Amino acid sequence: MTVVGWAYELAESLLRESLPRRWQHSQGVATCARRLAPLVEGRSEVLEAAAVLHDIGYAPALVETGFHPLDGARHLRTIPDADDRVVRLVANHSFALLEAEERGLSAELAGEFPLFDDPLLVDALVYCDMTTTPDGERTTSEARVAEILGRYWVDSVVGRFIRRAEPEIHAIVERVRAMADAAGVML
């Protein structure tokens, strides 16, 4: 089985029944990752696998810290032959380190799962996560950030983190769009 096939099976088993909306979002993020495949030459399976797995840490069976990037990555780390690139992308997706700081978990996250040194893959995953609604539909990063703030409140841990990350989220979205335009990739 391919890494992508394995990733879909795992994410579906963890999210489809218990968190169907998260499963829809994860599928939408993975669909976006497939659209970006021409930009990440030779690494498209890593991107798509990380995209479909990025929110598995919300699954009730995996919650340990309540910080989904860390909980999801810790679970993935226990699976033999799990690709370290996928694990680290899940752990650090969408500025997770900023949220980890808000939660007092930055030492654990950085120590266990160092930032992945492939800016294009990191940016591509941020792009896909931040341009996909909770229902798996396409949206703008502005609408997505507003939706997150509306769901979690401005002064919550997530609200504080997303406000800190917001300028960089929008910059990444624009950067990925520009790369896609230059490469003739339709988003």
What does each model-found stretch correspond to?
Residues 5, 9, 24-31, 35, ...:
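A broad detector of short, well-ordered amphipathic alpha-helices
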Residues 8, 67, 95, 113-116, ...:
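Phenylalanine-focused residue identity feature
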Residues 1-2, 14-42, 53, 79-82, ...:
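Divalent metal-dependent phosphate-bond-processing catalytic cores, especially two-metal-ion Mg2+/Mn2+ enzymes
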Residues 44-79, 87-98:
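His-Asp-centered metal-binding catalytic motifs of divalent-metal-dependent phosphohydrolases/nucleases
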